[in-house]
Amino acid sequence: MGLFDINDEKLQALYHRALVETNYGFVNPRKYPYLDRAIMQYARENGCSYDQALILAKTGNKMF
Protein backbone atom coordinates (compact mmCIF):
# COMPACT_ATOMS: atom_id res chain seq x y z
CA MET A 1 0.00 0.00 0.00
CA GLY A 2 1.50 3.24 -1.16
CA LEU A 3 1.24 6.73 0.20
CA PHE A 4 -1.40 7.83 -2.31
CA ASP A 5 -3.52 4.66 -2.26
CA ILE A 6 -7.10 5.17 -1.20
CA ASN A 7 -8.63 2.64 1.17
CA ASP A 8 -12.02 2.60 2.89
CA GLU A 9 -10.88 4.55 5.95
CA LYS A 10 -9.09 7.26 3.97
CA LEU A 11 -12.11 7.72 1.71
CA GLN A 12 -14.41 8.11 4.71
CA ALA A 13 -11.96 10.55 6.33
CA LEU A 14 -11.87 12.73 3.21
CA TYR A 15 -15.68 12.75 3.07
CA HIS A 16 -15.81 13.73 6.74
CA ARG A 17 -13.37 16.58 6.05
CA ALA A 18 -15.67 17.89 3.30
CA LEU A 19 -18.65 17.45 5.62
CA VAL A 20 -16.98 19.59 8.28
CA GLU A 21 -16.06 22.23 5.68
CA THR A 22 -19.76 22.52 4.76
CA ASN A 23 -20.75 22.79 8.43
CA TYR A 24 -22.43 19.38 8.28
CA GLY A 25 -24.57 20.38 5.33
CA PHE A 26 -24.90 18.84 1.87
CA VAL A 27 -21.58 17.69 0.40
CA ASN A 28 -21.27 17.99 -3.36
CA PRO A 29 -18.14 15.95 -4.13
CA ARG A 30 -17.57 17.84 -7.39
CA LYS A 31 -16.90 21.03 -5.39
CA TYR A 32 -14.09 19.35 -3.43
CA PRO A 33 -11.38 18.21 -5.87
CA TYR A 34 -9.54 16.11 -3.29
CA LEU A 35 -12.73 14.14 -2.54
CA ASP A 36 -13.71 13.82 -6.19
CA ARG A 37 -10.26 12.48 -7.15
CA ALA A 38 -10.24 10.07 -4.22
CA ILE A 39 -13.67 8.68 -5.12
CA MET A 40 -12.65 8.22 -8.76
CA GLN A 41 -9.38 6.54 -7.78
CA TYR A 42 -11.12 4.24 -5.29
CA ALA A 43 -13.73 3.25 -7.89
CA ARG A 44 -11.04 2.54 -10.47
CA GLU A 45 -8.91 0.46 -8.09
CA ASN A 46 -11.81 -1.59 -6.70
CA GLY A 47 -13.86 -2.05 -9.86
CA CYS A 48 -16.99 -0.31 -8.64
CA SER A 49 -18.97 2.68 -9.87
CA TYR A 50 -18.51 6.27 -8.74
CA ASP A 51 -21.89 6.15 -6.99
CA GLN A 52 -21.01 2.98 -5.08
CA ALA A 53 -17.75 4.55 -3.89
CA LEU A 54 -19.65 7.69 -2.83
CA ILE A 55 -22.11 5.59 -0.82
CA LEU A 56 -19.16 3.90 0.87
CA ALA A 57 -17.67 7.30 1.72
CA LYS A 58 -20.98 8.53 3.17
CA THR A 59 -22.21 5.48 5.07
CA GLY A 60 -19.30 3.08 5.39
CA ASN A 61 -21.36 0.27 3.82
CA LYS A 62 -19.98 -1.52 0.78
CA MET A 63 -22.65 -1.92 -1.88
CA PHE A 64 -20.47 -4.07 -4.17
What are these regions (language model features)?
Residues 6, 12-64:
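Acidic, low-complexity, intrinsically disordered interaction modules
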